[in-house]
């Protein structure tokens, strides 16, 4: 069927979102047409605001609307431990657990040779710079996802960090292999943190 151009553009825009196929995009586009104009305008403003106002923390790489982020700014956090995660959604998942009181470092990805992603393509160099600048850090917890890419990233980082003398641990595999941190419940994450091991 031929849609009006404005609807076609809206459908095409929705299909660019992860997990949204053509049929879902059509449903969403027609839902937008049924919404009140004020709600559509608020939705559009929220999208633009999120894109414009959210940036990355200059210390840890987490998403934030102020620099440094709320975690790096919190003086009550344990500044001797840094938990390395793949993306900002993992920070949110860890924070829901409420057991971990250290700092974070967000890689913004994982090593994946099949996709042409190497260590230089993720936030590794800033981690090394951070470790050289902050002598208070005594432990790095590698909390990358328990899949092939996450394991490859953890092994790479453990080998890279060993010469520094900083303790390097890996979260335990209370998480399902092939799963993502952001989908784990608080109890599973808590057990995984308690069962972390030396690498």
UniProtKB/Swiss-Prot annotation:
State the UniProt keywords alphabetically: DNA damage, DNA recombination, DNA repair, Metal-binding, Zinc, Zinc-finger
Classification via InterPro entries: DNA_Rcmb_RecR (IPR000093), Rcmb_RecR (IPR023627), Rcmb_RecR_Znf (IPR015967), TOPRIM_dom (IPR006171), TOPRIM_RecR (IPR034137)
SUPFAM superfamilies, sorted? Recombination protein RecR
Q: Which GO terms describe its biological process?
A: DNA recombination; DNA repair
Q: Which SMART domains match?
A: TOPRIM
Q: Name one GO molecular function term.
A: zinc ion binding
Give start-end positions of each zinc finger (C4-type).
57-72
Coiled-coil ranges from the UniProt annotation? none
Domain (Toprim): residue spans on this chain: 80-176
Q: Per the similarity annotation, which family is this?
A: Belongs to the RecR family.
Q: What does this protein do?
A: May play a role in DNA repair. It seems to be involved in an RecBC-independent recombinational process of DNA repair. It may act with RecF and RecO.
Spell out the PANTHER family in the cross-references: RECOMBINATION PROTEIN RECR
**What is the name listed in the Swiss-Prot or TrEMBL entry for this protein?**
Recombination protein RecR
Gene behind this protein: recR
